[in-house]
UniProtKB/Swiss-Prot annotation:
Its cofactor is Mg(2+). This is Ribonuclease T. Its EC number is 3.1.13.-. GO terms for cellular component: cytosol. One of its GO terms (biological process) is DNA replication proofreading. One of its GO terms (molecular function) is RNA exonuclease activity, producing 5'-phosphomonoesters. Binds two Mg(2+) per subunit. The active form of the enzyme binds two Mg(2+) ions in its active site. The first Mg(2+) forms only one salt bridge with the protein. Homodimer. Pfam families: RNase_T. Belongs to the RNase T family. The active site is at H181 (proton donor/acceptor). Keywords: Exonuclease, Hydrolase, Magnesium, Metal-binding, Nuclease, tRNA processing.
Length: 221
């Protein structure tokens, strides 16, 4: 395999990490006490030329876990009725098991070492995901325990915007505010944004890294 072909592998792009775009809608801000209401993930792949694309999607409405807190301000914001039977909600455990099975399979296929959360304001989603995994007592957690790719931070660097809708528009993507705060829609837009950020860096010549050239300018600053 040539050097360029090696650089075009997903496993070599992010230090063997398998990026999984995720958005979680919740009934509050406390990952340990407040209910997860909706979760969506999108896995990613790289084509033969090293361009990043969306791959598969999972989306679940979640039943509030026993004893969880439902904050009225949170559900007024995301407009989710946790107890509406038409949501077709499933248990948190079944949803998390399905997600982790998908991630483990992707890690294996892509030759990666572990999953890494990609999210907008990623600390929030990562905290809720880790709390849910612990709550349902799954020991083999494929995700990195603290590292994430935060598209809010990356967008602030690249286009000077940190709000998801503004970042998407600044980078040339459409955004429908009426669909915002749906886990499925926000995950889709975050995935589009992350792919464009990564691919734009490649188009500008930032990837693959020229280590020799970078070492020669290492004392510039």
């Amino acid at each position: 395999m040539s050097t360029n072909q090696e650089f075009n592998l997903l496993s070599n792009r992010f230090r063997t990490f398998y990026p999984v775009v995720i958005d979680i809608e919740t009934a509050g801000f406390n990952a340990n006490t407040d209910a997860v209401l909706e979760i969506a993930i999108i896995t990613l792949k790289m084509d033969e030329l090293g361009w990043l694309h969306k791959e598969d999607t999972l989306h679940f409405h979640i039943e509030p876990f026993k004893g969880s807190i439902i904050n009225s301000d949170a559900i007024a914001f995301n407009k989710i009725d946790p107890f509406n039977p038409l949501r077709g909600a499933i248990s948190e455990k079944i949803a998390i098991q399905s997600i982790l099975k998908k991630v483990r399979n992707g890690i294996k296929i892509q030759g990666c070492s572990r999953g890494i959360v990609v999210a907008h304001n990623a600390n929030f989603d990562h905290n809720f995901l880790m709390a849910a995994i612990q709550r349902v007592k799954i020991k083999n957690n494929p995700f990195h325990p603290f590292a994430t790719f935060d598209t809010a931070a990356l967008s602030g660097l690249v286009v000077g915007q940190t709000v998801l809708s503004k970042a998407c528009k600044a980078i040339g993507l459409s955004f429908d505010n009426h669909q915002a705060h749906s886990a499925l829609y926000d995950t889709l837009q975050t995935a589009n944004l992350f792919c464009e950020l990564v691919n734009r860096w490649k188009r500008l010549g930032g990837w693959p890294v020229d280590i020799k050239k970078n070492n020669s300018t290492s004392n510039k600053y």
